A protein has these predicted regions:
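Active-site core segments that coordinate phosphate-bearing ligands/cofactors
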Residues: 1-99, 107-131, 136-144
Length: 144
C-alpha cells in the first residue's frame, strides 16, 4: 500500500542531510517513544491520510537534542502511516499482518524497528528492494 502523504523523506531532509541522519541513527532508541506529537510537514497542506490543503505542520516543541528531534520526526511519519492503515481497516480492508518496504528508509534498521513498534506488525525485507521491481511484477501479472 502506498500513500500520498506530504510527510516523509523530504521533511527529514528539510532538517538534516543524509550524513547527519546516518550519524544520528545509531543513537536512536526505537523501543523508547520520545513523547513528541509531531505531524511532520514542510509547509501547510496534507493529502493522505487526511485531505486538508491548509493542515498545519506540528513540529514543536523542538528539543535541543537533534537525535530526539530526528526520532520524533520519524515517529510522526510512522503515526501517519499507522493512521492510513486504520482508515483502510475502517473501510473494510484487512489490517496488515506484516509490512514490506523499499527505498532509502527501508535500509535504516532503527526506522524499521520504530515502524514495527508503532504498526504492531513485523517489518519484512523484500528479496528485491527496488520499487521498480514491484511495479514490474504488477504489470506482468496484469498481462496474464
Amino acid at each position: 500500500v502506498g500513500g500520498g502523504s506530504n510527510s516523509g523523506g523530504a521533511v527529514l531532509r528539510g532538517f538534516f542531510n543524509d550524513a547527519q541522519m546516518s550519524a544520528m541513527t545509531p543513537r536512536l532508541n526505537p523501543a523508547l517513544p520520545t513523547g513528541l506529537d509531531y505531524y511532520p510537514l514542510l509547509a501547510p497542506g496534507e493529502r493522505f491520510p487526511l485531505n486538508d490543503p491548509s493542515y498545519a505542520p506540528r513540529l514543536t516543541p523542538r528539543p535541543s537534542d537533534d537525535v530526539t528531534f530526528f526520532q520524533g520526526l520519524l515517529e510522526g511519519i510512522a503515526r501517519i502511516e499507522q493512521r492510513g492503515y486504520q482508515l483502510l481497516a475502517e473501510l473494510g480492508a484487512p489490517s496488515p499482518t506484516s509490512v514490506r518496504s523499499v527505498g532509502g528508509g527501508a535500509q535504516n534498521s532503527a526506522w524499521t524497528k520504530l515502524r514495527a513498534r508503532l504498526l504492531k506488525v513485523p517489518m519484512l525485507t523484500p528479496e528485491h528492494q527496488d520499487a521498480a521491481y514491484g511495479a514490474a511484477l504488477l504489470a506482468l501479472r496484469g498481462t496474464q
